[in-house]
A protein has these predicted regions:
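Conserved, single-site charged/polar hotspot
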Residues: 1-173
Length: 173
C-alpha cells in the first residue's frame, strides 16, 4: 500500500490473540484457504488475464514452465509474481497478482498472503497450488478480526486503536 508511508496508521496488524495459536480472525471462512489449478485450467486463466500485461502473440500462450513468488513484503505477502514461459517471462506487481491468478472470471484470488507450489511434467507446469491466509489487502481493519475481538470482550475503542495505531477518536456531532 503506497499510502502506508504517508499514513503510518495504515499497516498490517497481527490478529494473534496472544496465546495458544488462536487468532481473532480464525472465524473467517477464508482464514486459511487453498486454490489448485491443473495445467489446462491455469492456461485458461492466464489466457484470460495476461493480455493486460504482455502480448500473447499469434500463437497464443506459450508453454508455462514455472510460476513463482519472486518477491515478498516484510509481512510475507506476495510483492511480485513471476510467470516463466519457454521464451521469456512476465513479472506481475503485487497490486495485480490477485487479478491475474483469478480462480474464476468474477472472483479474484482471496489475498496476496499465499505460498505457491508448482508441479511440473516434461518441463511444463502441470499443477499449481496456492495455500493462503485471509482475504483482502492486509492493511487496516480486519473485519473478521474485529468481530472476534468484540466477541472476546473488546470494545470499539480498543478494536479501532489496535487496527489504527496512533489515531484518536473524536466526536464530530
Amino acid at each position: 500500500f503506497a499510502t502506508a508511508r504517508a499514513r503510518p496508521y495504515l499497516r498490517s496488524v497481527s490478529d494473534a490473540s496472544g496465546g495458544g495459536g488462536h487468532y481473532y480472525c480464525d472465524i473467517s471462512p477464508r482464514f486459511r484457504w487453498r486454490e489448485e489449478w491443473d495445467g489446462q485450467k491455469l492456461r485458461a486463466i492466464f489466457t484470460r488475464t495476461l493480455p493486460a500485461f504482455m502480448p500473447l502473440g499469434g500463437d497464443g500462450l506459450q508453454r508455462i514452465t514455472d510460476v513463482q513468488v519472486s518477491r515478498t513484503t516484510r509481512s510475507g505477502r506476495v510483492a511480485e509474481l513471476r510467470i516463466v514461459f519457454e521464451r521469456g517471462d512476465v513479472r506481475i506487481p503485487a497490486a495485480d497478482v490477485r487479478a491475474v491468478l483469478r480462480p474464476e472470471a468474477d472472483r479474484p484470488l482471496a489475498s496476496t498472503a499465499f505460498q505457491l507450489t508448482a508441479t511440473k511434467d516434461g518441463g511444463e507446469v502441470s499443477r499449481l497450488v496456492a495455500a493462503g491466509a485471509g482475504s483482502g489487502h492486509g492493511v487496516g481493519m480486519c473485519q473478521w478480526g474485529a468481530v472476534g475481538r468484540a466477541r472476546a470482550g473488546q470494545d470499539y475503542r480498543r478494536i479501532l486503536s489496535t487496527y489504527f495505531p496512533g489515531t484518536t477518536l473524536e466526536r464530530l456531532y
